[in-house]
């Protein structure tokens, strides 16, 4: 009897036994590997999670810094624009009493007197020149009457009964007001009409 023909006590050839054992080992190995978790895999997963979290924090930080820089740039531009726009405010405030004095001089001047006509004309020209210059720099005079009272540009001093002007409208100007580029630098002192 040759070795190939020899049977094992169970009646199987040795090659069959080896094949059966090999299949059993293969069947057992996946279960064993599923149960065994390599500690390095856990560490890698943990490090990957930490890396993703750090990248998210870094990305958020970069976005926050960019937003802060953009806001700072905008605020700086606005501050510079306001500084240019309203740099003359202090100077204009110093000129207002001079303009008021020229206005009062014209109000009290005797325009009917021929001897005073040259002086009145000089005051008028000086006032006109000064107002033209300040207008070039964004100054506007608040002196309209018969317009609704605006607390942003008018300061009511008195209320006077009137049939000619609607109630709540400006009846008269006691002192002119001025704005610089839309900002009130001095409110006009006015009398306001009220119903009889």
Curated annotation (Swiss-Prot):
Keywords: Chaperone, Cytoplasm, Stress response. The keyword rRNA-binding does not apply. The keyword Coiled coil does not apply. InterPro entries: GrpE, GrpE_coiled_coil, GrpE_head. Signal peptide: none annotated. One of its GO terms (molecular function) is protein homodimerization activity. GO terms for cellular component: cytosol. Participates actively in the response to hyperosmotic and heat shock by preventing the aggregation of stress-denatured proteins, in association with DnaK and GrpE. It is the nucleotide exchange factor for DnaK and may function as a thermosensor. Unfolded proteins bind initially to DnaJ; upon interaction with the DnaJ-bound protein, DnaK hydrolyzes its bound ATP, resulting in the formation of a stable complex. GrpE releases ADP from DnaK; ATP binding to DnaK triggers the release of the substrate protein, thus completing the reaction cycle. Belongs to the GrpE family. Homodimer. This is Protein GrpE. It comes from Escherichia coli (strain SMS-3-5 / SECEC).
């Amino acid at each position: 009897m040759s070795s190939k023909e020899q049977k094992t006590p169970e009646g199987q050839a040795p090659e069959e036994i080896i094949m059966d054992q090999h299949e059993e080992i293969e069947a057992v190995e996946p279960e064993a590997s599923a149960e065994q978790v390599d500690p390095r895999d856990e560490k890698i997963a943990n490090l990957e999670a930490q890396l993703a979290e750090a990248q998210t924090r870094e990305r958020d930080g970069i976005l926050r810094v960019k937003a802060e820089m953009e806001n700072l740039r905008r605020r700086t531009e606005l501050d510079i624009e306001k500084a240019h726009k309203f740099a003359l405010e202090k100077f204009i405030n110093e000129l207002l009493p001079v303009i008021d004095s020229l206005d009062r001089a014209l109000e009290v001047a005797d325009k009917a007197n021929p001897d005073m006509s040259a002086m009145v004309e000089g005051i008028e020209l000086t006032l006109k020149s000064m107002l033209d210059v300040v207008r070039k720099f964004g100054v506007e005079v608040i002196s309209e009457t018969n317009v609704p009272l605006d607390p942003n540009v008018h300061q009511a001093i008195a209320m006077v009964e009137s049939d000619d002007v609607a109630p709540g409208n400006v009846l008269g100007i006691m002192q002119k007001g001025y704005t610089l580029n839309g900002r009130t630098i001095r409110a006009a002192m006015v009398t306001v009409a009220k119903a009889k």
